[in-house]
């Protein structure tokens, strides 16, 4: 009710200043979208033209900056086909000094043009990207674009409101359809295509599938990118943008504080510094980052047939390893295990183990303290006897809901009020009480398959 009252007051205020009901609603919607977008775009969100749906679908600047670095080996202006509000286009414009953006919806195209005003060499067109023919789309200098970037729409409208959308999993229902993407790749144009990270491996084309007379040396690389630990996207790199001899890549991107940025970066690498304002916008669009990648020359199907890794279970004093989401989704678990000298727990399980601790940005390492009981009654007694008051529960391959199991195991000790008291007591400097806040991390999984499968659990310590 409080939000409704605020909305009514905002409408009344705008109406008193001469705005129509429709204009008032649009202004409020823009203000709300900008507020929500600040978590993704920072202070720049205050001046962006966007909708809530567009903000949700837009890429974080740090991920887009990483992609812009991937484009650098190829010369020419980037054509962003299906640019939306130009969140990607703006990063490419900041990095290269120019961009060509195409958007089907005229209103969204006008938003894109406004968001690209900082770049004099940016061009925005409203039209159907399927009408695009490589070589006919020109940049501000009258030259054909050199690179194509696409983010096919993977949502369709549901219900009466535009914001009510559902993701599509039929590639031919994308906008533009995936067949258009492949036909464009067959022209040989260097191209990057953003897809959802859940896109099936079997849907990723082999290089020979995009070979043609115009493209005699095709290349395809699939890269799963995670940002700040969360899986963000799959990018298919085609032709000159694909790394030679690489079929799959898992990448983790982490934004750095400004003070950790490379202060020796030459000014010419940051275009459009004609004014302090444009310079600030450019800096916000190109945040400093560090990226770590793991690559394989094999497709997932090829690796399944040829990569063999020993299987074993960790013993107390050894280490359980949890690969990063990008490693898991790219099906690079076995090859990654080989590279760090680890074993698989099971051929179908994304946990690893090692006799020694492993320090690597693409894996979380836990020391195995002990195996724990699996019967919930016994487990609850064990938790009580150990005096644990907070539990982190991790699982793979078992039908456990961590939040529900945690509540049952801890009982009243796991309530918010109890946790606050325990933390206050643990942080007390009076010395009158012993700390009572005792956290623990539990891991549950299933080994084997069918009748031979069994559940197993460990008490572990994060390193």
Where on the chain are the PLM-derived regions?
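Conserved SAM-binding motif I beta-strand of class I
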Residues: 98-103
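S-adenosyl-L-methionine
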Residues: 104-144
């Amino acid at each position: 009710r409080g939000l409704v009252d605020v909305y009514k007051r905002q409408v009344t205020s705008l109406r008193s200043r001469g705005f129509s009901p429709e204009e008032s609603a649009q202004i409020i919607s823009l203000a709300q979208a900008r507020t929500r977008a600040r978590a993704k775009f920072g202070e720049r969100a205050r001046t962006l033209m966007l909708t809530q749906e567009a903000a949700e679908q837009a890429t974080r600047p740090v991920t887009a900056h990483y992609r812009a670095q991937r484009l650098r080996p190829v010369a020419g202006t980037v054509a962003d086909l299906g640019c939306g509000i130009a969140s990607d286009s703006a990063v490419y414009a900041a990095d290269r000094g120019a961009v060509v953006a195409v958007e089907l919806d005229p209103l969204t195209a006008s938003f894109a043009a406004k968001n690209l005003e900082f770049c004099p060499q940016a061009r925005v067109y409203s039209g159907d990207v399927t009408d695009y023919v490589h070589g006919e789309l020109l940049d501000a200098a009258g030259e054909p674009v050199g690179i194509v970037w696409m983010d096919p729409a993977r949502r369709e409208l549901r219900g009466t409101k535009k914001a009510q959308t559902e993701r599509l999993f039929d590639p031919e229902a994308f906008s533009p359809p995936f067949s258009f993407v492949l036909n464009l790749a067959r022209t040989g144009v260097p191209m990057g295509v953003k897809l959802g990270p859940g896109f099936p491996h079997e849907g990723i084309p082999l290089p020979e599938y995009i070979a043609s007379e115009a493209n005699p040396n095709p290349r395809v690389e699939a890269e799963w990118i995670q940002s700040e630990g969360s899986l963000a996207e799959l990018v298919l790199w085609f032709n000159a943008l694909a790394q030679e001899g690489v079929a799959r890549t898992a990448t983790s991107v982490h934004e750095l504080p400004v003070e950790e940025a490379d202060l020796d970066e030459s000014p010419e690498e940051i275009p459009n510094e004609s004014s302090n304002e444009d310079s600030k916008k450019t800096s916000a669009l190109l945040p400093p980052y560090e990226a770590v990648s793991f690559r394989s020359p094999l497709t997932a199907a090829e690796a399944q047939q040829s990569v063999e890794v020993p299987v074993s279970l960790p013993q107390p004093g050894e280490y359980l390893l949890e690969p990063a989401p990008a490693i898991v989704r790219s099906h690079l678990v076995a090859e990654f295990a080989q590279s760090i000298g680890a074993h698989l727990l099971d051929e179908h399980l994304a946990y690893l183990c090692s006799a020694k601790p492993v320090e690597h940005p693409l894996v979380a390492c836990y020391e195995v303290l002990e195996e724990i009981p699996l019967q919930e009654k016994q487990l609850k007694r064990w938790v009580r006897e150990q005096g644990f008051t907070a539990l982190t529960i991790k699982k793979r391959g078992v039908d456990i809901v961590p939040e529900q199991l945690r509540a049952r195991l801890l009982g009243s000790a796991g309530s918010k009020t109890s946790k606050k008291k325990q933390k206050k007591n643990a942080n007390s400097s009076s010395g009158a009480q012993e700390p009572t806040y005792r956290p623990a991390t539990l891991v549950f999984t299933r080994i084997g398959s069918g009748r031979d499968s069994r559940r197993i659990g460990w008490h572990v310590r994060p390193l």
